[in-house]
Regions:
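N-terminal signal peptide c-region/cleavage motif recognized by signal peptidases
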Residues: 12-14
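Soluble FAD-dependent oxygen oxidases
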Residues: 2, 16-603
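Classical eukaryotic N-terminal signal peptides for Sec-dependent ER targeting/secretion
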Residues: 1-10
Length: 603
């Protein structure tokens, strides 16, 4: 959740226009920006679905034309929910992606400087094409927003045209699927989902058909962003990543072509779009994925805890984490957290403590996969890890069986918090790191866990991601996923408009917490959908007319996110989008552009 470097000055003060700098994207207030007649023509072609939204928090500000105290009450309440931001054409789940430019707080400043100028409210592929064509022909910066649930801020930009796919919804189910242009059908269940189908809806509708899909833990994630970034979840240890499930996509290319891509046609794009990141190679209008027969799911909720600040705790954590590959071999997966000096009602930690808590899953594929076997595995794991420290640790393991993944998800996951300022950092941890140097493992996670905070140790890799067989023989998912067992995520947050605290938290995240994981697993990579942004600076400067934000540093993000696949991805990007109609940060091929005083220009 960090933003591009935005420097907001009055347009007349910028002195930058494409008439003088033809290598820059067009901006409002200059001769290069399309005329009102041109925007009106686009609106007519879209049957009136070209929006010019006010900043979403403007109803709370007396200086804004849309000021409405009654509406402000509703907006302020909705601001804290993910669905409210999803339903708004320009808002995002984290404030910092809009540079805190218009929060629903009357005492804070409000402007539209952090938001797109116009929005195409797309309902079909033709609408998307019209938006892409207009941006390309008029050299306007283009962004794509589905749900706004994007931890890299790719779904919003100032001085831009946005394509909003929110109303592109719909599902179609198949008992077998024949990709367009292919001679043979693919056996097994499949689902075609329109561009902005949310994963919560997809999970639920699959459940109603007695099917299960690979999905993550956040229901407001859109299917397009989830799959193009890789897509991890509790069942990826069984079936592979979300990108591994894709059978076909329909996309609009930067050149304005509406294409069906699969293993039989447009194969380079099919490879690139499954893991190469969103808003880069094209705009998804629909996607077809595999689905699997539902099966019972045994779920163990657990807590292992001790007093805060003990050396023994880190020894035990290193021992448990070293057993993750063995847990994967026994069919387990799930979500767990290392908690350091934490009080957490959600984790049942009622006083400051160090703990290890979460939920592990065991699908009932075999008669030996029972609730008792899952309970035994975890109780044995905790007993063995703490045997050297009698009386210093307490543990609980509670196992429950659910009819399928959806039943567990519905009972255990509510809406995520929203309307805050936050960034993430992450690392994929491979088996050699886990089973090798125990001291390095201990020191790495100790360095990566904030005091009073959490570090995730999600068991979402292993056999499923290693042995996945994506259609066409491969995809562009980070090769580090094929060796990884753990996806570790750390977050940092701060209050809006608190530049000093923001700089501090970003520096800690980059230079201390994520760096601890990088040193421990230097040859691995990161999951791009939940990762830090690259930058060469960690300064945060706020002047009266200028906002400059810099981001946590993911060194060499190209290879941290895509490994050896990056060079091929870059070649495909240059071929499919020679004009860089789609540009985002950090995305494939973005090296040729930079933000100059808030304007996107070629280097």
């Amino acid at each position: 959740m960090l933003t591009y470097i935005y420097q907001f000055l009055g347009f007349t003060a910028l002195g930058i226009a494409t008439t003088h700098h033809p290598k820059c994207k067009a901006i409002p207030g200059t001769n290069s920006w399309p005329s009102q007649a041109e925007w009106s023509h686009l609106n007519t072609s879209l049957s009136g679905r070209l929006l010019q939204p006010s900043p979403p928090g403007a109803v709370c500000h007396p200086t804004q034309a849309t000021f409405d105290p009654l509406s402000c009450v509703a907006v302020a309440a909705g601001w804290l929910t993910t669905q409210w931001h999803t339903d708004n054409p320009v808002s995002t789940i984290e404030n910092n992606w809009n540079n805190d430019t218009c929060l629903p707080v009357p005492t804070l400043p409000c402007s539209g400087k952090g938001y797109p100028v116009y929005v195409v409210n797309a309902t079909c592929a033709e609408d998307v094409k019209k938006g892409v064509d207009f941006a390309r022909e008029n050299h306007v910066r283009l962004v794509v927003k589905g749900t706004g649930h994007d931890y890299l801020g790719r779904s919003v930009a100032p001085k831009s045209l946005s394509i909003w796919t929110h109303y592109m919804r719909g599902l179609e189910f198949y008992d077998g699927f024949k990709p367009k242009g292919c001679r043979k059908s693919i056996d097994g269940a499949a689902i075609t989902a329109a561009a902005d189908t949310q994963m919560l809806e997809l999970d639920e509708q699959a459940h109603l058909k007695n099917l299960t899909i690979v999905s993550g833990g956040a229901g407001t994630v859109g299917v397009g962003g989830y799959l193009t970034g890789g897509g991890q979840g509790a069942l990826s240890s069984t079936y592979g990543l979300g990108a591994d499930q894709v059978l076909e996509m329909e996309i609009v290319t930067p050149g304005g072509d509406i294409l069906t891509i699969n293993e039989c046609q447009n194969r380079d794009l099919f490879w690139a779009m499954r893991g190469g990141g969103g808003s880069t190679f094209g705009v998804i209008t629909s996607v077809t994925i595999r689905a699997y027969p539902s099966t019972e799911l045994h779920v163990a909720s657990f807590l292992l805890g001790t007093g805060p600040g003990t050396e023994e705790y880190w020894d035990v954590m290193a021992d448990i984490l070293s057993q993750y590959p063995a847990l994967d071999e026994q069919g387990l997966s799930g979500y767990a957290y290392i908690a350091h000096n934490v009080v957490s009602a959600e984790m049942n930690i009622t006083s400051a403590a160090d703990g290890f808590a979460g939920a592990f899953f065991l699908p009932a594929f075999h008669s030996s996969n029972t609730s008792l076997s899952l309970e035994t595995v975890l109780k044995t794991l905790f007993a063995d890890a703490t045997a050297a420290y009698p009386g210093k640790f307490m543990s609980t393991v509670t196992v429950k069986t659910f009819p399928d993944f959806w039943a567990w998800y519905k009972d255990n996951n509510g809406p995520l918090d929203a309307g805050h300022n936050e960034v993430l950092g992450s690392r994929l941890i491979d088996g050699a790191t886990l089973t090798g140097n125990r001291t390095a493992l201990k020191q790495g996670y100790r360095a990566a866990t904030p005091p009073g905070g959490l570090t995730s140790v999600f068991l979402v890799g292993g056999k499923g991601t290693r042995n996945a067989k994506p259609r066409g023989g491969g995809n562009s998912v980070n090769p580090a996923w094929r060796k990884a067992y753990i996806h570790s995520v750390i977050g940092a947050s701060w209050n809006p408009l608190d530049s000093a605290e923001e700089a501090k938290q970003k520096a800690l995240l980059t230079d201390v917490y994520v760096e601890g994981l990088r040193k421990m697993a230097p040859d691995s990579g990161a999951y791009m959908n939940e990762a830090s942004l690259p930058s060469h600076a960690l300064k945060y400067i706020r002047l009266k007319l200028t906002i400059v934000q810099a981001y946590p540093d993911e060194p060499d993000f190209q290879h941290a996110f895509w490994g050896e696949n990056y060079e091929r991805l870059l070649a495909i990007k240059k071929k499919v989008d020679p004009q860089d109609v789609l540009w985002c940060h950090p995305c494939v091929g973005n090296e040729g552009w930079e933000l100059v005083d808030g304007v996107l220009c070629k280097k």
